């Protein structure tokens, strides 16, 4: 089993964790409906880049 030889300092721990932060998702307003949606994703109404891509049932 792997066991560390000496204790890691808080500085080293912080350096290791420096890339663990979550980034915010990019939100865009749809040009047709004005609805908020994630970038490169279809809106809840079925629009993508101003075109209807999912038909209503």
Curated annotation (Swiss-Prot):
GO cellular component: large ribosomal subunit
Biased composition (Basic residues): 1-16
GO biological process, one term: translation
Domain of life: Bacteria
Polar residues: bias regions: 21-31
Keywords: Ribonucleoprotein, Ribosomal protein
NCBIfam families, alphabetized: rpmF_bact
Designated name of the protein: Large ribosomal subunit protein bL32
